[in-house]
From Swiss-Prot:
Subcellular location(s) per record: Cytoplasm
Major localization class: cytoplasm
Organism per entry: Pyrococcus furiosus (strain ATCC 43587 / DSM 3638 / JCM 8422 / Vc1)
Subunit structure: Heterotetramer of alpha, beta, gamma and delta subunits. The nickel-containing alpha and delta subunits constitute the hydrogenase activity. The beta and gamma subunits (flavin-containing dimer) constitute the sulfur reductase activity.
GO molecular function, one term: nickel cation binding
Function: Part of a bifunctional enzyme complex that functions as an NADPH-dependent hydrogen-evolving hydrogenase with sulfur-reducing activity. May play a role in hydrogen cycling during fermentative growth. Activity not exhibited with NAD. The alpha and delta subunits form the hydrogenase component that catalyzes the reduction of protons to evolve hydrogen.
Enzyme Commission numbers on file: 1.12.1.3
Reactions performed catalytically: H2 + NADP(+) = NADPH + H(+)
PROSITE patterns given in the database record: NI_HGENASE_L_2 (PS00508)
Temperature dependence comment: Optimum temperature is greater than 95 degrees Celsius for hydrogenase activity. Stable up to 100 degrees Celsius. Loses 50% of activity at 80 degrees Celsius after 21 hour incubation.
Descriptive protein name: Sulfhydrogenase 1 subunit alpha
Binding-site residues for Ni(2+), renumbered to this chain: C65, C68, C418, C421
pH note: Optimum pH is 8 for hydrogenase activity at >95 degrees Celsius.
Length: 428
C-alpha cells in the first residue's frame, strides 16, 4: 500500500523579524521531512558596496537591519579600521560598546516580552496581553526605550547610528547626559532582575533537549563582552576570527534563500545561551549571582534556555554599561575623533550581536571596498534551528496539527531569528 503523507505548513512564522515558514511532512510512521523555508529574497548588500568609497559603504551596511543596525554599524566600522590599520582609543572603544549595549537591551527586551511571552500566556499577540499583563508590557517598553535612547544619544539617531564614524564619533554628548545615562541604567536594573525571575519560571521544553555545539566570540580582556579577536567553541576549540572560513562552512539548501552553516560538518548554535556557555566565567555583579543560582536552567542542551540567557544579559549589560561609562568619564573631556588614513588592507571583525556572532570581512583598495563578506547570527543558526523543529515535530506529530504548529513556532522564536539579515550574496 502506498504511504500517505500529510504536510503541515506554516506559511509565515509570526512574531519574528522577516519572512519565513515551516513545512513538516508526516508519513505513516512519523516525520519524513522538516524544512525551515526562508522566503526573504536576497538583498545583495555585499555586492552593492563593491566599488563604493569606504565611508559610503559604512553608511549602507546598517541598513541591513533596523533591529540590530548598531551591531552592523559597529562591526563594519571595526572591520574597516582593521583593514586600514587604525586602532581607536580605549575611551572611544568604551563608548562604542555602550552604544552596542543599547542595541542589546532594546533587542532582548522586545524579543522576550513582545515575541516570546505571549506564547507562555496563551496570547497570539502582545497587544492582547495589555489588560491582564500591564506591568510586563510597561517593563518591556521601559527597557526597550532605554536601549533606544542610549543609541540615540551616542549614535545621534535610534537606528543606523550615523554618528559612529571612522576614527571615533562625529560628536559626543555633554558629560551631564552621560551621567544621566548612568542614572537611568541604575533605575532599570530592578526591572532587568524582575525580567530574569519571570523568565526563569517559564518551561524549557524537554522535547528538544540534546547535545548542541555553541560558538561565541571570546571577549577581549577579563569581562564578558561584545568584541573579540577569537571565536570559541564549546568543544574546546578556539580560532582567530580571520580564519572563520576555515572552520565554518556555508552551503546552499534548495528550500531556502538563506544558506545554512556547519562547524566541523555539523549544525551549531550562536546567541545569548552560547555566550553564557562559553564565557560565563567572565560575568560579574548581579548577573554572576543570578547565573550561579540558576545554572541548571542555563543549560547548553536546550534552545529554550536562550530566552533566559537573554534575560540574564539584560542584567549584565546594564551593569557593564555603567562601568564603561565610568571608564570614559574618568578621561573626560574626550576628543570625539582621530584622523584615519585610508590605506589598502583587509580586516575581519567578529562581534556579538544580540542574536549571536556577526562577521564582517572587508577589503579596501584605493579607498574603496573591493570585497565584502557578512555572515549574520541567523545564517549560522538556521541548520540547528531546523534540527530542533524536527525534534519537536517527532514528539508531537500525532497531536492536533494546530498544537504542533504553535510548538514549532516557539522553537524558532527561541532563537530570536532575524530573517532579513540571514540572506546574503557575496558575488553577483
Amino acid at each position: 500500500m502506498k504511504n500517505l503523507y500529510l504536510p503541515i505548513t506554516i506559511d509565515h512564522i509570526a512574531r519574528v523579524e522577516g519572512k519565513g515558514g515551516v513545512e513538516i511532512i508526516i508519513g505513516d510512521d512519523g516525520v519524513k521531512e522538516v524544512k525551515l523555508n526562508i522566503i526573504e529574497g536576497p538583498r545583495f548588500f555585499e555586492a552593492i558596496t563593491i566599488g563604493k568609497k569606504l565611508e559610503e559603504a559604512l553608511a549602507i551596511y546598517p541598513r541591513i537591519c533596523s533591529f540590530c543596525s548598531a551591531a552592523h554599524k559597529l562591526t563594519a566600522l571595526e572591520a574597516a579600521e582593521k583593514a586600514v590599520g587604525f586602532v581607536p582609543r580605549e575611551e572611544i572603544q568604551a563608548l562604542r560598546e555602550v552604544l552596542y549595549i543599547g542595541d542589546m537591551i532594546e533587542s532582548h527586551a522586545l524579543h522576550l516580552y513582545l515575541l516570546v511571552l505571549p506564547d507562555y500566556r496563551g496570547y497570539s499577540s502582545p497587544l492582547k496581553m495589555v489588560n491582564e499583563y500591564k506591568r510586563e508590557i510597561e517593563i518591556a517598553l521601559k527597557l526597550k526605550n532605554l536601549g533606544t535612547w542610549m543609541m540615540d544619544i551616542l549614535g545621534s539617531r535610534a537606528i543606523h547610528q550615523e554618528n559612529a564614524v571612522l576614527g571615533g564619533f562625529g560628536k559626543l554628548p555633554e558629560k551631564s547626559v552621560l551621567e544621566k545615562m548612568k542614572a537611568e541604567l541604575r533605575e532599570a536594573l530592578p526591572l532587568a532582575e524582575y525580567t530574569f525571575e519571570l523568565f526563569a519560571k517559564l518551561e524549557q521544553y524537554s522535547e528538544v533537549e540534546g547535545p548542541i555545539t555553541h560558538l561565541a566570540v571570546k571577549p577581549r580582556g577579563d569581562a564578558y563582552g561584545i568584541y573579540g579577536d577569537y571565536i570559541k567553541a564549546s568543544d574546546g576549540e578556539e580560532f582567530p576570527s580571520e580564519k572563520y572560513r576555515d572552520y565554518i562552512k556555508e552551503f546552499v539548501v534548495e528550500h531556502s534563500f538563506a544558506k545554512h552553516s556547519h562547524y566541523k560538518g555539523r549544525p551549531f548554535m550562536v546567541g545569548a545561551i552560547s555566550r553564557v556557555i562559553n564565557n560565563a566565567d567572565l560575568l560579574y555583579g548581579k548577573a554572576k549571582e543570578l547565573y550561579e543560582a540558576n545554572k541548571d536552567l542555563l543549560k547548553g542542551t536546550n534552545p529554550f534556555a536562550n530566552n533566559l540567557a537573554q534575560a540574564l544579559e539584560i542584567v549584565y549589560f546594564i551593569e557593564r554599561a555603567i562601568d564603561l561609562l565610568d571608564e570614559a568619564l574618568a578621561k573626560w573631556p574626550i576628543k570625539p575623533r582621530d584622523e584615519v588614513e585610508i590605506k589598502d588592507g583587509f580586516g575581519v571583525s567578529t562581534t556579538e550581536a544580540p542574536r549571536g556572532i556577526l562577521v564582517y570581512a572587508l577589503k579596501v583598495e584605493n579607498g574603496r571596498v573591493s570585497y565584502a563578506d557578512i555572515i549574520t547570527p541567523t545564517a549560522f543558526n538556521l541548520a540547528m534551528m531546523e534540527e530542533h523543529v524536527r525534534m519537536m515535530a517527532e514528539k508531537h506529530y500525532n497531536d492536533d496539527p494546530e498544537r504542533l504548529k504553535i510548538l514549532a513556532e516557539m522553537v524558532v522564536r527561541a532563537y530570536d531569528p532575524c530573517i532579513s539579515c540571514s540572506v546574503h550574496v557575496v558575488r553577483l
